[in-house]
Amino acid sequence: MFCEQCEQTASGNGCHQWGACGKSPEVNAVQDLLVYCLRGLAPVVLKAKELGISTHQADVFTGEALFATMTNVNFDKKRFTKYIRDCITIREQLKAAINQPVAWTDICCYQPNFNESLVEQGQNVALTLISQATNNLDIFSLKLTVLYGIKGCASYNFHAQELGQEDEKVYSFIQEALASLDRNDLSLNDWVNLALKVGETNLKAMELLDAGHTSTYGHPTPTSVPLNPRLGKALLVSGHDIKQLAAILQQTANTGLTIYTHGELLPAHGYPILKQKYPHLYGHYGTAWQNQTKDFAKFPGAIIVTTNCLMPPHETYDEKLFTIGPVGYQGINYLASDETGTPDFTPAIEKALSMPGFTTEETPRNVMVGFAHDAVLKVADTVIEAVQQGKIRHFFLVGGCDGAKPGRTYYTEFVEKVPKDCIVLTLACGKFRFFDKQLGSIGTLPRLMDVGQCNDAYSAIKIALGLANAFNIEVNQLPLSMILSWYEQKAIAVLLTLLYLGIKDIRLGPTLPAFITPNLFKLLSETYNLQSITTPEKDLAACLA
């Protein structure tokens, strides 16, 4: 196997025996085969679009299928086999609809054999892709960057589409990018531009998702969220999917269950319509994804995982674990969606009601969420005045993905060392390194503001652009430093968005992507001053200099 799409890839060079995420070589092979088939579907979709034939089914399918291949989403070989079958079926249906002679390339005509050799077929197409690296390693690096960025973009677009927010330009570019992966006539500069186009498209996908969330559930408002459980039966919802969380809340109304969020669903508590409509959405349980084996084992109720990050489940809790959407693990309960895209959560609800729930109370603890762009920009005048009066010296955006590497303690130490006249904005699961720190406030402004989920990088961008406009300066002139952590492909998409916007001086860690060559990193460093983190002390001093 060959996989280097996540930050924890083995020895920083790539997983070759078994995935650091827990993915087997067999699952990796069928994932590679699915991506290969999607690359063959893409030119057919683009031709159909050119002729005015509807490609909506293919576009939505492509998004979910790419999402399923992301790190810590789906480990179920049978589910990937079905995705591959569906991909070929959709491709051939579109060819029939095109109904004219087309000189399709070999990849558009590929027919997998659905037998015991499926894994070997996946391994073969992976080797074919890897062999391209010998031609130009830097271009191969950019191809992988585009692929991984498109996976992240597709995941955000998947959630936006669930909420009724769609843009044909996003769908079209995802297909164009996939089709480009089979081209060998593009220059290094062409691939750089394509990677930046991924960033541009991802910005639009995040904008669509923000519109879907805020038009459906209201703009987030600063909200206190309990970290201590309350007495009673309980159900835990993990992942990112706020639409599915809302469906769970609707189906559990008047059951007596208390609903807790886990991981990246913490920001859901900031959406006013959810809180007003569903009072049994109570608190948050656990911390970041890599601690789930401990958190899930202790939780005295059923658990539903809506998106990444899923780790290989332990036998102590596998019977109370349920997955939906693109998420899966062989042998774990899967709740399929109906034609409206919503699962019947009855099995999970019944499991939760059969379990003891919380029987003892704990000391109350709370954290604040809800500092998205609408809430922050409403107090822009207060922020500007505080900066002008010297009360606020600097802003730090410290966020991104969390992970299990010891080096990630850097982010905790960094936030702890930030001077008291500075404000920390945070987002995504990287916040769990410090989300419960009591940093105090500057006047009426809390020094630690949770902007939201990883897709709420869009909110952080809007805040930065809004403040730059208010100060009548460029974003790169703001007293703002970005200290980012990455783990999976959504983070790659967000990084490409920031580079597309021309944002400079980003510090990235805990390690650099294995798929980025030294030459490519040098190019990014020279163009954007992208740099790796060093120590909290050195980086703080440099940012404040």
UniProtKB/Swiss-Prot annotation:
<dbReference type="GO" id="GO:0046872">
    <property type="term" value="F:metal ion binding"/>
</dbReference>
<keyword id="KW-0408">Iron</keyword>
<dbReference type="GO" id="GO:0004601">
    <property type="term" value="F:peroxidase activity"/>
</dbReference>
<dbReference type="InterPro" id="IPR016099">
    <property type="entry name" value="Prismane-like_a/b-sand"/>
</dbReference>
<keyword id="KW-0479">Metal-binding</keyword>
<feature type="binding site">
    <location>
        <position position="21"/>
    </location>
    <ligand>
        <name>[4Fe-4S] cluster</name>
    </ligand>
</feature>
<dbReference type="InterPro" id="IPR010048">
    <property type="entry name" value="Hydroxylam_reduct"/>
</dbReference>
<dbReference type="InterPro" id="IPR004137">
    <property type="entry name" value="HCP/CODH"/>
</dbReference>
<feature type="binding site">
    <location>
        <position position="429"/>
    </location>
    <ligand>
        <name>hybrid [4Fe-2O-2S] cluster</name>
    </ligand>
</feature>
<keyword id="KW-0411">Iron-sulfur</keyword>
<feature type="binding site">
    <location>
        <position position="15"/>
    </location>
    <ligand>
        <name>[4Fe-4S] cluster</name>
    </ligand>
</feature>
<dbReference type="InterPro" id="IPR016100">
    <property type="entry name" value="Prismane_a-bundle"/>
</dbReference>
<feature type="binding site" description="via persulfide group">
    <location>
        <position position="401"/>
    </location>
    <ligand>
        <name>hybrid [4Fe-2O-2S] cluster</name>
    </ligand>
</feature>
<feature type="binding site">
    <location>
        <position position="454"/>
    </location>
    <ligand>
        <name>hybrid [4Fe-2O-2S] cluster</name>
    </ligand>
</feature>
<feature type="binding site">
    <location>
        <position position="309"/>
    </location>
    <ligand>
        <name>hybrid [4Fe-2O-2S] cluster</name>
    </ligand>
</feature>
<feature type="binding site">
    <location>
        <position position="264"/>
    </location>
    <ligand>
        <name>hybrid [4Fe-2O-2S] cluster</name>
    </ligand>
</feature>
<feature type="binding site">
    <location>
        <position position="3"/>
    </location>
    <ligand>
        <name>[4Fe-4S] cluster</name>
    </ligand>
</feature>
<dbReference type="GO" id="GO:0042542">
    <property type="term" value="P:response to hydrogen peroxide"/>
</dbReference>
<feature type="binding site">
    <location>
        <position position="488"/>
    </location>
    <ligand>
        <name>hybrid [4Fe-2O-2S] cluster</name>
    </ligand>
</feature>
<keyword id="KW-0004">4Fe-4S</keyword>
<dbReference type="GO" id="GO:0005737">
    <property type="term" value="C:cytoplasm"/>
</dbReference>
<dbReference type="InterPro" id="IPR011254">
    <property type="entry name" value="Prismane-like_sf"/>
</dbReference>
<keyword id="KW-0963">Cytoplasm</keyword>
<feature type="binding site">
    <location>
        <position position="240"/>
    </location>
    <ligand>
        <name>hybrid [4Fe-2O-2S] cluster</name>
    </ligand>
</feature>
<dbReference type="Pfam" id="PF03063">
    <property type="entry name" value="Prismane"/>
</dbReference>
<keyword id="KW-0560">Oxidoreductase</keyword>
<dbReference type="GO" id="GO:0050418">
    <property type="term" value="F:hydroxylamine reductase activity"/>
</dbReference>
<comment type="function">
    <text>Catalyzes the reduction of hydroxylamine to form NH(3) and H(2)O.</text>
</comment>
<feature type="modified residue" description="Cysteine persulfide">
    <location>
        <position position="401"/>
    </location>
</feature>
<feature type="binding site">
    <location>
        <position position="490"/>
    </location>
    <ligand>
        <name>hybrid [4Fe-2O-2S] cluster</name>
    </ligand>
</feature>
<feature type="binding site">
    <location>
        <position position="6"/>
    </location>
    <ligand>
        <name>[4Fe-4S] cluster</name>
    </ligand>
</feature>
<comment type="similarity">
    <text>Belongs to the HCP family.</text>
</comment>
<protein>
    <recommendedName>
        <fullName>Hydroxylamine reductase</fullName>
        <ecNumber>1.7.99.1</ecNumber>
    </recommendedName>
</protein>
<dbReference type="GO" id="GO:0051539">
    <property type="term" value="F:4 iron, 4 sulfur cluster binding"/>
</dbReference>
